[in-house]
Amino acid sequence: MEGADDIVPMGEVVGLHGVRGWVKVYSHTEPREAILDYPHWYLRRDDGDWVPVERTAGRCQGKGLVAAFRDVEDRDRARAYIGLQIGVPRRDLPELPEGQYYWADLEGLAAYTTGGEPLGRVSHLFATGANDVLVLQGDRERLVPFVYGQTVRRVDLTAGRIELDWDPDF
């Protein structure tokens, strides 16, 4: 069984689909249907523990995704899964080229200017049409575009910090 640090959040169960226990899935992957390519899924329980779940089917449905799990054969059983995060083992993720990172690895990093001034911590990220955006929580919230080599000068996952070319007054 994987440890909690070995599971990377990749989506969430967001609703029910039909009467046979299928669920609607919101995917953080790009493209969104790539989450269906991962063979091992885990669900995060309310207590924070990740538990393995066997996905028996999954497909694109309209503008979203739907999935079925073993032993979940009706809406009542499927309802218990709504709101649970979907994670995959880190070992299943492909290696990324330099300058690209999984969001889960960036969340929680301490952010500093190139001059060493603290800006806060990366609380989360979101995607825009142009680029991803870091949301920093510190003395105030800051939104910083994630543009490697420009606003993002250095990422040190081992040290838990990210260096940004960013005016602390902005």
Curated annotation (Swiss-Prot):
Assembly description: Binds ribosomal protein uS19.
Show the GO cellular component annotation of the record: cytoplasm; ribosome
Which GO biological process entries does UniProt record here? ribosomal small subunit biogenesis; rRNA processing
Q: Which InterPro entries match?
A: PRC_barrel-like_sf, PRC_RimM, RimM, RimM_N, RimM_N_sf, Transl_B-barrel_sf
Question: Which species is this UniProt entry from?
Answer: Alkalilimnicola ehrlichii (strain ATCC BAA-1101 / DSM 17681 / MLHE-1)
SUPFAM superfamilies on file? PRC-barrel domain (SSF50346), Translation proteins (SSF50447)
Family the UniProt entry places it in: Belongs to the RimM family.
| Keyword Cell division applies | no
Matching entries from Gene3D superfamilies are given as: PRC-barrel domain (2.30.30.240), RimM (2.40.30.60)
| Pfam family name, one | RimM
Record keyword Chaperone present: yes
What this chain does, per the entry, is described as: An accessory protein needed during the final step in the assembly of 30S ribosomal subunit, possibly for assembly of the head region. Essential for efficient processing of 16S rRNA. May be needed both before and after RbfA during the maturation of 16S rRNA. It has affinity for free ribosomal 30S subunits but not for 70S ribosomes.
In the record, which residues are listed under signal peptide? none
Record keywords, A-Z? Chaperone, Cytoplasm, Ribosome biogenesis, rRNA processing
What one GO molecular function would you report for this record? ribosome binding
Q: Which cysteines are joined by disulfide bonds?
A: none
Instruction: Name the gene for this chain.
Output: rimM
Report what the protein is called: Ribosome maturation factor RimM
The record's comment about this protein's domains reads: The PRC barrel domain binds ribosomal protein uS19.
Q: Provide the protein's localization.
A: Cytoplasm
Q: Where is the PRC barrel domain?
A: 98-170
